[in-house]
From Swiss-Prot:
One Gene Ontology term of the molecular function aspect: protein homodimerization activity
Quaternary structure and interacting proteins, as annotated: Homodimer.
Function: May act as a component of the auxin efflux carrier.
Record organism: Oryza sativa subsp. japonica
Binding site for (indol-3-yl)acetate: I51, N112, L114, Y145, I267, V268
Tissues expressing the protein: Expressed in shoot apex and panicles.
Any single GO BP term: auxin polar transport
Pfam families from the UniProt entry: Mem_trans
Positions in the Extracellular compartment: 1-6, 60-68, 122-131, 189-191, 248-251, 308-311
Protein name in UniProt: Probable auxin efflux carrier component 8
Membrane topology: Multi-pass membrane protein
Entry GO CC: cell periphery; endoplasmic reticulum; plasma membrane
Alphabetical list of InterPro entries matching this protein: Auxin_Efflux_Carrier, Mem_transp_PIN-like
Topology Cytoplasmic: residue spans: 28-38, 90-100, 153-167, 213-226, 273-286
Gene name tied to this protein: PIN8
């Protein structure tokens, strides 16, 4: 059962992100500290340095020999269904075909597992949930962010990105390190940690700068906002639920998979969308509004799945 202490732990993890975003917003709206060109430079730093190093740190510190196979298969199936579905819809209905394929995939399958998910679901389902969500974070960083970057690069036709190599390096080191119990030299790990620890904070700072440069906070408009929230909080969990059930997941493991899919939008896809100028307004709105309703939505899914058990 979720306690007030568990909710406080979630707020403890998420409020600092909002502090970074609000400071960035005020630095543009009130203090006029940055020009649009400088804001673009900050976002490029986040995309090319902070996020790749954060991905390396997450992947290299997770044991690849202790993964839940059913969770991996269900995650792959969910993403595959989302890709195929949005590819078909985008081709049939949307003028910006590739843009909506990328945005729809990001909204439906890439939640904020690291910051919001782990503390919240540990309160709901215990330490087991934290361990499982760490594996999902690795899959996100290693496979799905790489695929997302590939889609962005395919759209831009501009070559490969630095994040791909950092994730591959992180996986190689994790395979070697956990197999033979080798640790990175402290001077190397501290150098990586210095930049990676600020990765999410800098991403939220970039989000605040982007929001401040828009004429209104809901930059994409009310209709697109509602569509984005519906994809994030309804379609994403539905796809994950169907995929997990089809793979054979039951009980607590199935519930964890569904609730983590109903978490608010991840920050990293926005950083990439801003860097490649692909519907960043939709993702920024999904993050801002989604973070505000994260706890109520997760609790709604949690209680909805325990009511049948009580009956």
């Amino acid at each position: 059962m979720v306690s007030w202490k568990d909710i406080y732990l979630v707020l403890e993890a998420t409020v600092p992100l909002y502090v970074a975003m609000i400071l960035a917003y005020l630095s543009i709206k009130w203090w006029k500290l940055f020009t649009p060109e400088q804001c673009s430079g900050i976002n490029k730093f986040v995309a090319k340095f902070s996020i790749p190093l954060l991905s390396f740190q997450v992947i290299s510190t997770t044991d690849p020999y202790d993964m839940n196979i059913k969770l991996i298969y269900s995650d792959i199936l969910q993403k595959s269904l989302a890709l195929l579905g949005f590819a078909a819809i985008s081709k049939a209905c949307c003028a910006e075909k590739f843009d909506w394929l990328i945005t729809g995939f990001s909204l439906s399958t890439l939640p904020n597992t690291l910051i919001v998910g782990i503390p919240l679901l540990k309160g709901m389902y215990g330490e087991q949930a934290g361990k499982l969500l760490s594996q999902i974070v690795v899959l996100q960083s290693l496979i799905w962010y790489t695929l997302l970057l590939f889609l962005f690069e395919l759209r831009a036709a501009n070559g490969m990105a630095t994040t791909t190599s950092s994730e591959t390096t992180g996986l190689i080191w994790a395979l070697v390190g956990f197999r033979w119990h080798i640790r990175l030299p402290l001077i190397v790990s501290n150098s990586i940690r210095m930049l990676s620890d600020g990765g999410l904070g800098m991403a939220m700072f970039s989000l605040g700068l982007f929001t401040a440069l828009q004429t209104k906070i809901i930059a994409c408009g009310a209709k697109r906002m509602l569509l984005a929230l519906a994809i994030r909080f309804f379609l994403g969990p539905a796809l994950m639920g169907m995929s997990s059930y089809a793979i054979g997941m039951r009980g607590v493991l199935l519930k964890i998979a569904i609730v983590q899919a109903a978490l608010p939008q991840g920050i990293v896809p926005f950083v990439f969308a801003k860097e490649y100028n692909v519907q960043a307004d939709i993702l920024s709105t999904a993050i801002i509004v989604g973070m505000m309703v994260a706890v109520p939505v997760a609790l709604a899914y949690y209680f909805a799945m325990i009511i049948p058990a009580i009956k």
